[in-house]
Amino acid sequence: MRVVVYLSTSGVYGDCGGARITESQPLHPRNARAVRRVDAERALTRQARRGLFRLIILRVPGIYSQTRLPLERLRAGTPALAPEHDVHTSHIHAADLAAIALAALRRLRRRVYPRVRIYHASDDSEMKMGDYFDLVADAFGMTRPPRLAREEIAARVSPALLSFMRESRRLDNTRLKRELPIRWQARDVAQGVAAAAARGA
């Protein structure tokens, strides 16, 4: 039996108003990128249920690593949302995402799964976006970004960043930790950023 691990996006949920959500949360994609991922998830799920393969879908939040931090954005002085307008985000270190994908493949090959299983490939962080930028700035001795109200920020950031600023959710990773245990490199983004700063990005 063939096995497939598909890396989707947590963007398939759209805006959840900062709520903590599980894998059973209804999908409400709000941009073309997320719509494409929903279409791909559904197409793969149909094929898996027809018996073509066993499938794990990993819904992935913001990926970061030693070489994937918002340092250029901080140097450019790109603003973040004011605290009262800020959005909740989730994160995963690239090395931990790779470990999760490998754990998923191993479990699929043991045939202990239903034909389709979904996981939030997220660490334990519960952090707002602006606080994440502040965290990185502090770790690397940089100036924190200015904070602007939601109505002011649209003209100052890219459309891609603005789309992230319009969605707020917290991913519950209970199922992941119970069924796909890994040796974490960074259980939360604060630990991962501190390690990156210690090594020098």
Predicted regions and their residues:
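NAD(P)-cofactor binding segment of oxidoreductase domains
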Residues: M1-L7
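Conserved C-terminal active-site "lid" loop/helix of NAD(P)H-dependent oxidoreductases
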Residues: A154-R183
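Catalytic helix-loop patch of NAD(P)-dependent Rossmann-fold dehydrogenases
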Residues: G17-I57, A82
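Conserved catalytic-site region of short-chain dehydrogenase/reductase
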Residues: L7-R20, L27, I63-T67
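Substrate-positioning beta->alpha
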Residues: I63-R73, A82-R106
